[in-house]
Amino acid sequence: MAGLSFADSASLHEGRPLLLPSSFRESVTFKDVVVNFTQEEWKHLDPIQRDLFRDVTLENYTHLVSIGLQVSKPDMISQLEQGTEPWTEDSCIPVGPLEDWKKRAGNSVSSLELDISEEHLFSETVVTNSKRDDGSLEKLQANQQMLPREVQITEKTAPTCESNLSVSSSFITQTEVALDQPSTKTRAKQNSHPVKKEKLCKCNECGKAFTYCSALIRHQRTHTGEKPYKCNECNKAFSRSENLINHQRIHTGDKPYKCDQCGKGFIEGPSLTQHQRIHTGEKPYKCDECGKAFSQRTHLVQHQRIHTGEKPYTCTECGKSFSQRGHFMEHQKIHTGEKPFKCEECEKTFTRSTHLTQHQKIHTGEKTYKCNECGKAFNGPSTFIRHHMIHTGEKPYECNECGKAFSQHSNLTQHQKTHTGEKPYDCAECGKAFSYWSSLAQHLKIHTGEKPYKCSDCGKAFSYCSSLTQHRRIHTREKPFECSECGKAFSYLSNLNQHQKTHTQEKAYECKECGKAFIRSSSLAKHERIHTGEKPYQCHECGKTFSYGSSLIQHKKIHTGERPYKCNECGRAFNQKIHLTQHKRIHTGAKPYACPKCGKTFRHCSSLAQHQKTHTEEKPYQCNKCEKTFSQNSRLTQHQRIHTGEKPYKCSECDKCFTGSVHLTEHRSTHTGEKPYNSECPQTFSQSTYLTQHQKIHSGEKLLGCEDCEKAFQCHSALTKHQRLHPAVAAVGTSLT
């Protein structure tokens, strides 16, 4: 064979076809440098090995075309370019001279498992030539990364169908075929030339070097953005054929990798391997800093960034950085507004497929994750993990500023914003800023009125899924959160946390205006509105504003007439749970609040507080119009309506208006005939004040005395009527002690 000239070598390097003598072209074909696999053999290759095989085969074919050795495109090349699997039928694999190989191996077995390593697939190739001039040889050797590489195939077991794995030495001088038994892990090395591991392939963009040319080609796609593998269904493109094949299974629904434990299917083999660690509990990746172990290496890498503080993913829109690529991708959808994943049940859209999957479990009621401690089930793994920390008390995330620990990293991140005061999320409607995106999303529902979460028991709708979960506990009366100190149970974790502080008496949040301390930061924020006069919650019906959201919710029930809390004794309904609790004491006769001065007992804490002012004569609330003082702010508000003439409470039956809600409630009983207040005798009353007056008949109590004749009466109205009998009518009766 004639030697390659310097010009020929340059043509090869520049990618131009290199025409060789006909004797050389006839001696080497694509079949001489290709390895065929059956479907069974192909299954034994992992994704990295398959991808490696594709790159090597395509590269070899490209070089054959470049030097003029291949004209027509083989079917295998078309399959590889389209991203399909290139295995062939058993009958299509030619039977070749493997007898010598079997004799050398000294073993005969039944099934074939191919272990193709990158080291073997990319071992150096030497093109022999007896008459090359030294200059051409040096140039050709400098460009060896452009030439096909040798293929070394390690066979773990021999095939039932003998494959022709011999390669013509005219083009590739040496092909290693070695037997590797799984029990011995030793290979029969038949190549006299050791594998070279110099990193000769260097990227011109970033300088990174690679041992193998195909690895450099894959790497360069990160700079060029080249994605040659395109999906015919959705036109999405990929840089690697293996990624295209996995993606196409999304369209076909093919999940060939099944879990033996639970039957769950997966698109990729590595996903199955990771999933199986849930059943085995295997966590092979351990953090050197804190000793925490993980089932996936990617999770360890992400976790280690907590210690290093590394945030390699930066948003070009707002400059915010993230430690995880998934969080970065999710964040970018905030700017684009992209929500590609849609629920077919309620048409709600999501930025992530995992969020859609978890949301769909709301419709199906599926709860696959069960707690072994208490038996409670959850529809998502993250919710289950958070719940499990309640039992273990684990709080691995600690704030560097104040030392407070949290069970979730997201809670730590949110907490740290209390130190920095950062509020990066602004509402476009009202301009209000929030520390967290989730808080902004919840706030936006106030403007839109969106309530996608509906209770199946009573039909009530909620803006947030968590609110629906909490509401359902009214029907189920579930109280899953129990205090370890006193055994008291609560429906909500926040209530338990608040209650536990009563044991420790911890009041960490202090008001800068008056020095009053609070257990919760939210309580401090509400208290501060007393000083600022801020009332951010407005009723759309009447325009009235409130300091607290809960007050607005309660107020709205006046307009809607909603009364969800019903008394089982008399059927009377209330718009607030606390009113029902107070009402039940009428039936039970419970008066848990006692005055320490005189021992008088009351059903309500507010009644006790009002009564105690009779001992101190404290009346801190003064009317600006007539300077009359009151012991309660509500009494002052009601009194001021005398001056303004305001009567905001209207009867839906007769349109009569009243200054106070209590008066409206009492008036409604005239229409319904309802008399819910009863005492020792069978007599019932429509108003609690009538009952109080009546009970004095049984007790013989007469507290109001006439100044003229010292006659005593049980009620103020009776005293007023009596005083009209005297020539000089007194204005006010005095209280007897």
Curated annotation (Swiss-Prot):
Its localization reads: Nucleus
Species? Mus musculus (Mouse)
Q: List, for all copies, the residue spans of the domain called KRAB.
A: 28-99
Q: Which residues cross the membrane?
A: none
In this chain, where does the modification Phosphoserine occur? S117
Q: What does this protein do?
A: May be involved in transcriptional regulation.
Annotated keywords? DNA-binding, Isopeptide bond, Metal-binding, Nucleus, Phosphoprotein, Repeat, Transcription, Transcription regulation, Ubl conjugation, Zinc, Zinc-finger
One GO cellular-component annotation of the UniProt record comes to: nucleus
Q: Name one GO molecular function term.
A: DNA binding
Q: Which CDD domains match?
A: KRAB_A-box (cd07765)
User: Family per UniProt?
Assistant: Belongs to the krueppel C2H2-type zinc-finger protein family.
Q: Tell me, what's a Pfam family for it?
A: KRAB
Q: Where are the zinc fingers (C2H2-type)?
A: 201-223, 229-251, 257-279, 285-307, 313-335, 341-363, 369-391, 397-419, 425-447, 453-475, 481-503, 509-531, 537-559, 565-587, 593-615, 621-643, 649-671, 677-698, 704-726
Is Metal-binding one of the keywords? yes
* UniProt cross-link Glycyl lysine isopeptide (Lys-Gly) (interchain with G-Cter in SUMO2), position: K185
Which processes are annotated in GO (biological process)? Answer: regulation of DNA-templated transcription
Name of the gene this protein is made from: Zfp184
Major location (coarse): nucleus
Q: Does the entry feature the keyword Nucleotidyltransferase, yes or no?
A: no
- Its name, as the record gives it, is Zinc finger protein 184
